[in-house]
Amino acid sequence: MSKLWSGRFAAGAHPSAERFTGSLAFDRRLWPQDIRGSLAWAAALERAALLTPAEHRGIADGLARIRDELAAGTFPFRPELEDIHTNIERRLTELIGPTGGKLHTGRSRNDQIAVDERLYLKDVCAAVGDGLREVQRVLIDRAAQGIEMAMPGYTHLQRAQPVVLAHHLLAYVFM
């Protein structure tokens, strides 16, 4: 199977170069965002009359099946396809035929990865925020138990005046 970028080359890349440049091991975690971005793009293509409603439905149904396969761990990854985007696109074309290729109308790989990364970061930042709020909740609960508990305060890594544990813990809540 030829690579997307292989049109001008007489021979394939050396296997070590393929291992070095392949990103599937890293970007496979982007599959939820890749599916979301592709669903949104397919809807935009239909609104622009570049896909018929039936083509849009077919793409959406195919992407839903791929999402289910990925979530269940049954998706047939093909490392020779290099990245998650190409794996999903090829699987979509296998499932629904040539209409799957229309999904990239007006969208470059750079557009696709930029969307995927932004969606991924948005999702991860939300999860980090949830985790931080949980840490704050635990610190507040522990501070409530340490209202009268003294501990040494530090200045320039030297023990200084005594402080209340609750005050010390609540300082971390507001950092």
Q: Can you annotate each of these PLM segments?
A:
Residues M1-M175:
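A helix-coil-helix interface module used to build multimeric assemblies
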